[in-house]
From Swiss-Prot:
Active site: 205, 343
Residues of the signal peptide: none
Gene Ontology molecular function, alphabetical: magnesium ion binding; phosphopyruvate hydratase activity
Keyword Metal-binding included in the entry's annotation: yes
UniProt keyword list: Cytoplasm, Glycolysis, Lyase, Magnesium, Metal-binding, Secreted
Gene that this polypeptide is encoded by: eno
Annotated residues for binding of (2R)-2-phosphoglycerate: 163, 343, 372-373, 394
Superkingdom, natural source: Bacteria
EC number from the UniProt entry: 4.2.1.11
Cofactor annotation remark: Binds a second Mg(2+) ion via substrate during catalysis.
Pfam family, any one: Enolase_N
Family: Belongs to the enolase family.
Entry protein name: Enolase
Length: 434
């Protein structure tokens, strides 16, 4: 009854108006799963391949008809008749069909769309919510949200080089309360920006993209003001997280790495100077998480950064690890970072995503389930976060429907779980001093 009878791929548009892949999988019992694939703006060079058409006369070369065709031909033919309950086997078949180390032939966007749609169809066939199907009876932890309320870098035309300034409602007692706290701070930040005569336009992930702020510290000072205006205490109720996305402004010069802050006066920092700068920031502001603080190939720098502040701060590898167990294994062996960002389309299949989360936890690393800057109404990552009891999710501000779709799904899951739902707040940082 759970055999696959149809696989349908199509081209839809994401939150930036760029084409992306959507897939329907239909089972013999009539159950249907649908999944849409996100896309990043600041992408790591080690990510799985997002197959684009490169036809400049159509969507500026960003069409995905090649990937859609791969879904509707090769992948469909390989999966028809397979049992949707055999997720690992289905993903294995697609990886073997692709025959490349980075999914460059069929496209990670094609493979992931099918992988997620299969899981959703299987869950529907069994009459289970997706998080319960993926994680089992112990799936009960609602994640601490990292709410990106101020955008910079590649995500916005603002005056800061760091890409994301996030707040974490660590003092909340439930996910619902966390959402309220985050929304209130976000709205107060908007009022402050408006009063300062600055822009309240938002970036790709729904955070404000002001043009008049004075660099990184100016952004942190504004957010601190907004937290206080909302009636919350810095460090106790709300903590900060940064996504530097350093690979976007990192240059290798004579075997060493330099970081060029073009939007902040043209400052250039070495790896050691970056580490010192981060130390100064965490001593001044309640920053408990720094993502991609150094370039994706600056392994020695990552080890230094982790030794310097890894006992006090979550050091998250995004471009460094790209949700890839081989790169994560290297990081664990070297002592680079203490946390991994989980982006499903970086690796391109559900099975490999779950493997990365499991490897991280076994090594004492935390895992942060994440959206991409180009999103859709698909809320799968909300279910993945609860299924794996990951403890943290990063999915934008309380603005833009493509971001709110994930938060609203988590609110529904919390309601469904009822009294067994857990929200652990500050305790999700189990590998640092709190």
């Amino acid at each position: 009854m759970t055999g696959i009878v149809e696989v349908i791929g199509r081209e839809i548009l994401d939150s930036r108006g760029n084409p992306t892949v959507e897939v329907d999988v239909i089972l013999e019992c009539g159950a249907k799963g649908r999944a849409a694939v996100p896309s990043g703006a600041s992408t790591g060079s080690h990510e799985a391949v997002e197959l684009r058409d490169e036809d400049k006369g159509r969507y500026l070369g960003k069409g995905v008809l090649k990937a859609v065709n791969n879904v509707n031909t090769e992948i469909r033919e390989a999966l028809l008749g397979m049992d949707a309950l055999n997720q690992v086997e289905i993903d294995k078949v697609m990886l073997e069909l692709d025959r490349t180390p980075n999914k460059g032939r069929l496209g990670a966007n094609a493979i992931l769309g099918v992988s997620l749609a299969v899981a959703k169809a299987a869950a529907e066939a069994l009459g289970q919510p997706l998080y319960k199907y993926l994680g089992g009876v112990n799936s009960k932890e609602l994640p601490l949200p990292m709410m990106n309320i101020l955008n910079g870098g590649a995500h916005a035309d603002s005056a800061v080089d760091l890409q994301e300034f996030m707040i974490q409602p660590v003092g909340a007692k439930s996910f619902r309360e966390a959402m309220q706290m985050g929304a209130e701070v976000f709205h107060h930040l908007g009022k402050i920006l408006k009063a300062n005569g600055d822009s309240t336009n938002v970036g790709n992930e729904g955070g404000y993209a002001p043009s008049k702020i004075q660099g990184t510290e100016g952004a942190l000072a504004l957010i601190s003001e907004a937290v206080k205006a909302a009636g919350y205490e810095l460090g106790k109720d709300i903590t900060f997280a940064l996504d530097a996305a350093s690979s976007e402004f990192c240059k290798e010069v004579n075997g060493k790495y330099e970081y060029h802050f073009k939007r902040e006066g043209g400052v250039v920092r070495t790896t050691d100077e970056m580490i010192k700068w981060y130390e100064e920031l965490i001593n001044k502001y309640p920053i408990v998480s720094i993502e991609d603080g150094l370039g994706e190939d600056d392994w020695d720098g990552w080890v230094k950064l982790t030794k310097a502040i890894g006992d006090r701060v979550q050091i998250v590898g995004d471009d460094l690890f790209v949700t890839n167990t081989e790169r994560l294994k290297k990081g664990i062996e070297l002592g680079a970072g203490n946390s991994i960002l989980i982006k499903l389309n970086q690796i391109g299949s559900l099975t490999e995503t779950l493997d990365a989360i499991e490897m991280a936890k076994r090594a004492g690393y935390t895992a942060v389930v994440s959206h991409r800057s180009g999103e859709t109404e698909d809320a799968t990552i909300a279910d993945v976060a609860v299924a794996t009891n990951a403890g943290q999710i990063k999915t934008g501000s309380t603005s833009r429907t493509d971001r709110m779709a994930k938060y609203n799904q988590l609110l529904r899951i919390e309601e469904e779980l009822g009294s067994v739902a857990q929200y652990n707040g500050r305790d999700v940082f189990y590998n640092i001093k709190k």
